């Protein structure tokens, strides 16, 4: 496939706004055929207002799930409203419960507890699926450019939130033992190709993504006997709001051209991997990472 280029563009705030992107990311691939794989399940998706998170929310809803998602208050209301509206349109066809959009700073334990409690309270105590997806990244050429505050911020969003959300969701998932289907409950963590290949200008971000891989493997071992599966997806270059919010215009223009397929992926091409891992189709999988990255060969 020929190399693809995007129009030069830049956004000044993280994690970026999907409604301001050109072109807009694709959330649902046109050929997608839902099959009720997640019917009667309750899912939480962090960072679900845009990008990969939005695509996961919509695919889960198409598969019959009731979906709640989080977003950053004061920055992502418009994207969150778009996602919530799309979820309600789908819900009218599937008969799932009304979706929820929850503003939250997930870098802190108590905030994560409140999100989980709010979702469980709204849906009769049930949580079957947790997708940890919230992330931010900042391009910096040298380790000496990263302050202690910078490091803490990225780690709080990218890995602390995964730990805290999982900690509180697991308490609810344990109550679902025997009622969540053959595949049990599922936690799915979004890592990155950078965890495997490295990225010299995204040092702190890359470190968090490596931590997510290790966290996924360890938690999978801890929860295996409890009927809770823990897996992850490590996307390659995907066209999401994080890209124009992270990089200079020229880098955005060339984004994704370095992979064997010669182009960036769309969120619509990543979301089906989350559906698979959340569904009973993956009932014998835990501790694994799926690599949706345009043909880059990685180990692990």
UniProtKB/Swiss-Prot annotation:
This is Glucose and ribitol dehydrogenase homolog. Belongs to the short-chain dehydrogenases/reductases (SDR) family. It comes from Oryza sativa subsp. japonica (Rice). Its EC number is 1.1.1.-. May act as a short alcohol-polyol-sugar dehydrogenase possibly related to carbohydrate metabolism and the acquisition of desiccation tolerance. May also be involved in signal transduction. The active site is at residue 205. Transmembrane segments: none annotated. Residues 1-14 have a biased composition (Polar residues). The lineage of its organism: Eukaryota, Viridiplantae, Streptophyta, Embryophyta, Tracheophyta.
């Amino acid at each position: 496939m020929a190399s693809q280029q995007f129009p030069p563009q830049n956004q000044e705030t993280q994690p970026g706004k999907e409604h301001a992107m050109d072109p807009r990311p694709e959330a649902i691939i046109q050929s997608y055929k839902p099959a009720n794989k997640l019917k009667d399940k309750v899912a939480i998706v962090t960072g679900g207002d845009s990008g990969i998170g939005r695509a996961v929310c919509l695919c889960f809803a198409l598969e019959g799930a009731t979906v709640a998602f989080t977003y950053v208050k004061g920055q992502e209301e418009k994207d969150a409203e778009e996602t919530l509206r799309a979820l309600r349109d789908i819900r009218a066809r599937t008969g799932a419960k009304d979706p929820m959009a929850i503003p939250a700073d997930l870098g802190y334990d108590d905030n994560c507890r409140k999100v989980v409690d709010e979702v469980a309270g709204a849906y009769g105590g049930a949580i079957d699926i947790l997708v940890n997806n919230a992330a931010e990244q900042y391009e910096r050429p040298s380790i000496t450019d990263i302050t202690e505050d910078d490091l803490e911020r990225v780690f709080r969003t990218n890995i602390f939130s995964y730990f805290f959300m999982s900690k509180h969701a697991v308490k609810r998932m344990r109550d679902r033992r025997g009622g969540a289907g053959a595949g049990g409950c599922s936690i799915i963590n979004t890592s990155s190709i950078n965890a495997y290949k490295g990225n010299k200008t995204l040092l702190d971000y890359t470190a968090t993504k490596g931590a997510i891989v290790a966290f996924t493997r360890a938690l999978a071992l801890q929860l295996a006997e409890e009927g809770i599966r823990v897996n992850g997806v490590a996307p390659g270059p995907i066209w999401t709001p994080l890209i124009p919010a992270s990089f200079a215009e020229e880098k955005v223009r060339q984004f994704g051209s370095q992979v064997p397929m010669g182009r960036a992926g769309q969120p619509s091409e990543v979301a089906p991997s989350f559906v698979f891992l959340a569904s009973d189709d993956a009932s014998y999988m835990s501790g694994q990472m799926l690599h949706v990255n345009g043909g880059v060969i990685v180990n692990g």
